[in-house]
Amino acid sequence: MRAETRPDFFFIWSGDRFSLLFRIAVSLVSCHHPDARVVVYVVGPSPTSVHFQALLEDGTAEVVALDPAEVLGRLPLALSGAADVYSRLPRASHAARSNILRYALLHDHGGVYLDTDVLTVARFPDLDGVDAAIGLETVWSGDRRRVSGDRTVWMSPTTCAWALAYSAVRCDSLLASGRLGVAGRIDRFGHAWTELQANNAVLASSPRSQFIAEVLAGIGEVDSAIRYSTGPTLVHDVLSGTNANVRVFGPDVFYSIPPGQSFRLFEDVTFRLPDSAVAVHVTASNHETRVARMSATDPCARPGTVIHGLMDADAGMQQGKGRVTAG
């Protein structure tokens, strides 16, 4: 089934574990864009969780049952290889399947795609006149080798430096709520073991976008058995070689916290989003137990953290108190 009109923002969901965090992600988009059409596409059976039911009842988004075969069938013949790859993916490969569907939907109707663990904190910039828009994220420089199965990455001196830095920041966040300032001190040397990579958790395009068409064409050339091969790795490689008019945002806009430090959103009371932040990627896959347990009375985050602040702000929004902000 297609949305009645072209959505301005859309999410894709499959599975039953629709948590409070994901409902808040949808609500925050509507909060900052009250006139926008927000769609949640559901693949397979609708979730039965109370949070999904709340989403249905509060009217912040249109929920649309999505038929992958129909969506992929609308792709031009030259891009039909993406449908072939999708059909070969195991049903449990939710992330890889979602990657392909988001590209197909963007190609079909354009708009802004967001992962359900992306929390909007400000109004999105005007993207008129661009073919597509994407954000860069700070990642460990050895991660691509790791996910491809290259075990020699663990013997690299930069990997040892990264592991020590991670451990120091993790201990400060867990034991001292970030008050020792370890992350700020280490960031000065982070260029030695990190690099910038495009991520597809936030992705915008016009209909029939050249960039998205190039991404869809590239799906048939990757090894879909390798994690991220249809996601960040693919969009980064395409971005590196495209001549399309793509607006590229720095990490401060969507990914101000590196995925390997996403625990700080729940634990570090000193971390603040930059003024330029439009959204923050929680990387919920790193916090599955915590995200599953989150409730209105227990945000599973320390008071003073970004997540706690957004939870409080969302509660205020639900009570009609106005615009959501976060520290």
Spans of features found by a protein language model:
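Glycosyltransferase-associated regions of secretory-pathway enzymes
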Residues: M1-S98, T116-G327
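Small-residue hinge/turn detector
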Residues: N99-G110
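Short aromatic-hydrophobic micro-motifs that form the base-stacking/packing surface
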Residues: V112-L114
